[in-house]
């Protein structure tokens, strides 16, 4: 298995890169390697690598963990980036995934803060990747998703015991969930505390196990949930659905489901938050004399007035024609960049007209000069 590359190297940014620099790098690379656009054999693998790096560095807590511990810091809390490679995966249990210092010291010395291993525990969180079209991310949508999860057993209702029976206090740990173990070490005899090997730390012993779940109290199910994707979501953002994760243990609540959005790029538009960007070609004549053109927006076509003497790369703003603001009201703007296109071929009438224009402008024109239009544009229309 190939060694993972440094996340900063993957995105091509320095370790002191700002959030905005990381975001811009991700946008550029995700569009470059998106499987819908790039058909190279390794495009999908590179897209996943870029996505995994962005997920780590765009989150302040994950980035801090990565800066301190490297890839090991990612494995402790988030199960190796399951969302980048499959539909859903476990997030892990937050700090529990790393283990606490209390656990480390207490396992050797039998002291420290005692946990309650047989108490209620919340179920694991799950992650689901939802692919969205560009327009779906802009305007939102309602849909249903299905995924597999560990749910409470419908037969024993999570107890793990056969109906009509109940779990008993563990005969070995007496309900504590842990046992004291004495070991001989180079420092002498030492006592340590370990999870009970009979009850698995629950403090309860099931002698008549449920036939459905075989004593686990849980069973796998295909779960369906309705999701309302808010208008204005962006690639890489996530939404939390409380209680839609996996079943807890010992009466604990269900975990949560985190939906991570993957937005396909548009062939026509670029987007940064609520701002939409598009480039539109116009002719030399339209730029010189002015015109009214039709421009596509995410809301439909609109009219845009081009003033006489417009220069190439001029940006016009269409207010309120951008994407809805995710955390606010109203829409952003659409920014239209016009590019003046120089014709590559001319008929005789067009050449004569431009020669006359050059004479009227005081230009000395060599008819064989292939840079005729560059001369005119540079002299008459350059800022």
Swiss-Prot record:
InterPro entries according to UniProt: DnaJ, DnaJ_C, DnaJ_domain, DnaJ_domain_CS, HSP40/DnaJ_pept-bd, HSP_DnaJ_Cys-rich_dom, HSP_DnaJ_Cys-rich_dom_sf, J_dom_sf
Intrachain disulfide bonds: none
Residues binding Zn(2+) 1: 153, 156, 210, 213
Bound cofactor: record note: Binds 2 Zn(2+) ions per monomer.
Keywords carried by this UniProt record: Chaperone, Cytoplasm, DNA replication, Metal-binding, Repeat, Stress response, Zinc, Zinc-finger
Zinc finger (CR-type) residue numbers: 140-222
Required co-factors: Zn(2+)
Keyword Transmembrane assigned: no
Residues of the J domain: 6-70
Protein's cellular compartments: Cytoplasm
Main location: cytoplasm
Subunit structure: Homodimer.
Record's protein name: Chaperone protein DnaJ
Organism ancestry: Bacteria, Bacillati, Bacillota, Bacilli, Lactobacillales
Gene: dnaJ
């Amino acid at each position: 298995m190939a060694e993972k590359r440094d996340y900063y190297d993957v995105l091509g940014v320095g370790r002191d890169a700002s959030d905005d620099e990381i975001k811009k790098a991700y946008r550029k690379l995700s569009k470059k390697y998106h499987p819908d656009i790039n058909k190279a054999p390794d495009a999908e693998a590179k897209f996943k690598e870029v996505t995994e790096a962005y997920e780590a560095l765009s989150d302040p807590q994950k980035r801090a963990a990565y800066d301190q511990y490297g890839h090991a810091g990612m494995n402790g809390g988030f199960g190796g980036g399951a969302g980048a490679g499959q539909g859903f995966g476990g997030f892990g249990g937050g700090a529990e995934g790393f283990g606490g210092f209390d656990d480390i010291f207490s396992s050797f010395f039998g002291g420290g803060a005692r946990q309650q291993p047989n108490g209620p525990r919340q179920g694991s969180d799950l992650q689901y990747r939802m692919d969205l079209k560009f327009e779906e991310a802009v305007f939102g949508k309602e849909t249903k998703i299905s995924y597999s999860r560990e749910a409470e057993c419908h037969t024993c209702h999570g107890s793990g015991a056969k109906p009509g029976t109940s779990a008993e206090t563990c005969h070995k740990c007496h309900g504590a969930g842990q046992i004291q173990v004495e070991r001989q070490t180079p420092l002498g005899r030492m006592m340590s505390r370990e999870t009970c090997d009979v009850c698995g730390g629950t403090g309860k012993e099931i002698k008549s196990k449920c036939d459905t779940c075989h004593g686990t109290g849980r069973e796998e199910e295909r779960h369906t949930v309705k999701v309302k994707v808010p208008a204005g979501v962006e690639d890489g953002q996530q939404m939390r659905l409380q209680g839609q994760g996996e079943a807890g243990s010992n009466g604990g609540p269900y975990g949560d489901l985190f939906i991570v959005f993957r937005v396909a790029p548009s062939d026509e538009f670029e987007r940064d938050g609520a701002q939409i960007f598009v480039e539109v070609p116009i002719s030399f004549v339209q730029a010189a004399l002015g015109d009214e053109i039709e421009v596509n927006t995410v809301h439909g076509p609109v009219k845009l007035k081009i003033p006489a003497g417009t220069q190439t790369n001029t940006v016009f703003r269409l207010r309120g024609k951008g994407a809805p603001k995710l955390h606010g009201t109203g829409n952003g703007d659409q920014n239209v960049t016009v590019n003046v296109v120089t014709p590559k071929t001319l008929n005789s009438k067009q050449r004569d007209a431009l020669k006359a224009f050059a004479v009227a402008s005081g230009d000395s024109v060599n008819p064989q000069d292939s840079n005729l239009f560059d001369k005119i544009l540079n002299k008459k229309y350059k800022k």
